[in-house]
Structures are given as C-alpha cells and as structure tokens.
C-alpha cells in the first residue's frame, strides 16, 4: 500500500470491493467523514487516534455505529481490532394516543399512506416508499404485504430491504395500497427524507406533537406487546431476526407501566388498564 494513500482513497477502494448494499456504502462513507479522518493519510492512523475520535462522540448509538464502520473498513490494517463495540441505547418515545397520531397523519394528503404503512405494518420509511399495489397478497380473507424492496435514503437506489418478509395488514390499509396510482408510486431521485420533512411540518401545526416514521414503527411494535400479542408473532410482524431484538429494542417501558405493576392494598383503587385496541378492525 502506498504510504501517502489518503483515507478516502483507501476506504472507497475497500467499500467498492466488498458486497455491501448501496445504503450501507453510503452510511460507511458518512461515518468515516463524521470522525474527521477522511482527508488524512492512512499512514497517520493509529489505534489511539481512533479511540480518541470515537470517544469524543457524545451520542452512544452514533459512537456504536461508527465503531462498527471503522472495524469493518479498516479490518485489514489491524488498527481497529481492539475497539470495543458498546451496547446501544434503545430509542424511547413518549407515544401519543392512537387518535392523535391519526389526526396528525391525516393532515398529510401526500404522504399519509406511507405513514400508515409505518404505523400499521411496521415498515421502515424506505420500505414504505417501495410499496406498490403489486406488494399486496390476498390469502383467503387475509391481506399481506410482501416486503422485498426499499428505497435508499437519497432516493437513488431501489434495492433489498434490511429484512425481507411478509407482514399481515388490515383490510382498510390493503385497500389504500391497492388504490395507489402510477403517479403516486415513488420515483427515483425522490429522497425518503421527504416523508421525514413532512412529519416536521405536521408537528409544527396544532398540538406541537413530534412524529417520525421510526416512531410509528415503534408504535406498531409497542401496541402489539401491550395487547399481549405473542412475542414470536411480534417478531415476525416486525421482521426481526431474533426475539432478543424484539424485546430489547421495542419493548418500551414508561412510568405508567411501573404504576400498573404495583400491588394494591384492599383499600386502594384498582389501577385502570388502558383501552385495548384491535389493530385489524
């Protein structure tokens, strides 16, 4: 290897030679740039430099993801082999009520179908953008979505999703998908962030409640868990690779859940349970 080779040259060469998905390649480049080594010479890299760069990242989830990037891209150099991959911190949300979420989503005439796909099918935003009427499968009286494609964040690549699978959806949502016209189908060059930006605009109006596609996917999982849907069904609906992911990342606990868990004395009022929502009505 040329002693004067720059990190950007080395990284792009490594990334192009490996079988990474398009979005993974984009994320890896972004991660390396984020720690300020992109224009440095490879010869100047050291384990201590990586440790200091990563240790300065305040967000633990970001630090974890960039550590994974560095260990992967610079694996052959051996300078990142001792970096520890820290545990991530699950995202938590103060979830609005179902009615409030519907009220917000319905304000978006252009993107409401995509947001409902996140909320009632647990899709990631790139997966929701890739859905077309051909994605709907009817088996008996049940409707399913085939999840086998996803748009990249920049809208330049339609590739395979993080996890391929089938998700059962309510009939009303299947009807909405079947009504998607050719003009409404997501086009190349449209960044999926358009939906996230639309969510920001929705949040600026009315109740000042902030929503985003990941929150809606989170609601989908949390709602099933709170309705005591068997965990293996939640795992399949979320298309997780194992049950640990389902329980660790998406089982959100609030103070109210602790209150419900407290034993009561005979003179105490029973703690009222939340309304049970039937997802498939």
Question: What positions do the PLM features span?
Answer:
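Short, aromatic/basic-rich helix-turn unit that serves as a nucleic-acid recognition element
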Residues: 2-31, 54-61
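Short, polar N-cap/turn motifs at the start of nucleic acid-interacting alpha helices
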Residues: 136-140, 229-249
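Catalytic-site neighborhood detector that most strongly recognizes the C-terminal catalytic loop/helix
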Residues: 20, 95, 238-263
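Basic, Lys/Arg- and aromatic-enriched nucleic-acid-binding interface segment
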Residues: 60, 64, 83-125, 129
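Conserved tyrosine-mediated DNA breakage-rejoining catalytic core shared by Y-recombinases
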Residues: 98, 131-176
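C-terminal secondary-structure termini that scaffold catalytic or DNA-interacting sites
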Residues: 160-166, 171, 264-281
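N-terminal DNA-binding recognition helix of tyrosine site-specific recombinases/integrases
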Residues: 31-85, 122-126
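Active-site/catalytic core of tyrosine-dependent DNA strand-transfer enzymes
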Residues: 170-208, 220
